[in-house]
Structures are given as C-alpha cells and as structure tokens.
C-alpha cells in the first residue's frame, strides 16, 4: 500500500525546452512560482531516508535526484534501489513490452499523464505492488532460486525476497499444482494433458 505521497513542481531556474514541455505538459508558466530544488531538498532527503528508491529504469531517475541533492549540499542517496523494469522482466516474462505505459495498459493500471514525474511515480508504485503480489504467489523453491540470483540484479531485492520466503514458509506445503524437482518448482502435469 502507498504510505505517503509528495508531489511538487520544481523551478529549474532555466527555461524548459519545448520538447520537454510537449513530452510532460509542464510549461515555464507552471513552474515560474515553484520552489527551486534546494528548497525541497531536505524534504526529499527525509522521504528517502531508510527507504527503498523504486523507479522504472531506476538509475535514470536516481541520477537526477542524486545530482540535485548533491548540488543542494545534501548527501546522495545510498539506500537500496528497486528497478521495476528489471523486476517486470522476471515476473512478467511474456509481456510484449516493458515500457511503463505498455505494462500499465496490460495490467489495467490507469496512467493519465505519462512522462509527468508524479503520474509516473504513482503508476510505478502500482506496478511494484503488482510485482510483489506476483512474487508472493511463486513457490518458495522459485523464490529461493531468485534470491540466489538476485546478487547480480540491479535491484536490491534480496531482503524483500527473504520476507516473502519467510511468509510463504509459514504455509509449509507447495500448492497442489506445483512439484519441486532439484530445487526447481514446476507445474505438475495433469492427466488430461497426457491424454491429448
């Protein structure tokens, strides 16, 4: 669930290029009275403290935040990151595309203002909730395998997977349709499948 929301226009202290205005719908007029990043840097830093930074293509978004925090005299974010592009590739391997707008369409997530930071953040949060739900349904053996592989991921997902595994192990048996063979969870063959 979403615990808190924060959204603010930021005055970039320079003109917004026309192509950015066309992409985002944010004009120079809309930000002329907004605070520069320095004035909200402390709030942003506080929100990031002891938190995961979740984004769709996390290093792209984080690079802007890092640059602005540093320019404002604040410490760079050093916490864990979760990349919903990477995680979507894992839990939705059959998706036609991993663009945020197309994943939203496929998962029936309403995305009214693509390329606007607040709208993108909102739907990325919803996408992440879908990812967590999908992970929660995976068999413990699959989660354990993912956890072992996660050391090579962009996403710092190991602790998240550990929490899901711990919760799943409270339900000690695998679902009826799953069998584990050499630590790999696979769907059992149904008798009907063998007869066709």
Predicted regions, residues:
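Conserved non-catalytic scaffold segment of RNase H-like nuclease domains
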Residues: 1-78, 93-115
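Conserved NTP-handling cores and scaffolds of large molecular machines
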Residues: 92, 107, 131-135
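Buried hydrophobic packing segments
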Residues: 65, 87, 124-128
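Acidic active-site catalytic centers that drive phospho-/nucleotidyl reactions
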Residues: 57, 61, 83, 120
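Acidic, divalent-metal-coordinating active-site segment for phosphoryl/phosphodiester hydrolysis
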Residues: 116-131
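Conserved beta-strand -> loop -> alpha-helix junction used to position metal-binding or nucleic-acid-contacting
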Residues: 75-88
């Amino acid at each position: 669930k979403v615990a808190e929301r924060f959204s603010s226009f930021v005055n970039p202290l320079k003109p917004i290029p026309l192509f950015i205005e066309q992409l985002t719908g944010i004009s120079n007029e809309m930000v002329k009275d907004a605070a520069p990043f320095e004035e909200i840097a402390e709030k942003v830093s506080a929100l990031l403290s002891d938190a995961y930074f979740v984004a769709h293509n996390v290093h792209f978004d984080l690079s802007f935040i890092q640059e602005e925090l540093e320019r404002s005299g604040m410490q760079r974010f050093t916490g864990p990151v979760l990349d919903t592009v990477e995680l979507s590739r894992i839990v939705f391997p059959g998706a036609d595309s991993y663009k945020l707008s197309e994943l939203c369409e496929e998962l029936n997530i309403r995305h009214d203002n693509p390329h606007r930071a607040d709208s993108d953040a909102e739907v990325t949060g919803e996408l992440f909730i879908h990812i967590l739900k999908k992970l929660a349904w995976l068999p413990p053996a699959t989660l354990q395998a993912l956890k072992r592989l996660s050391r090579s991921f962009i996403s710092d997902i190991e602790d998240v997977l550990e929490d899901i595994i711990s919760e799943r192990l409270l339900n000690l048996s695998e679902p009826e349709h799953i069998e584990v063979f050499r630590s790999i969870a696979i769907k059992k063959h149904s008798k009907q499948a063998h007869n066709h």
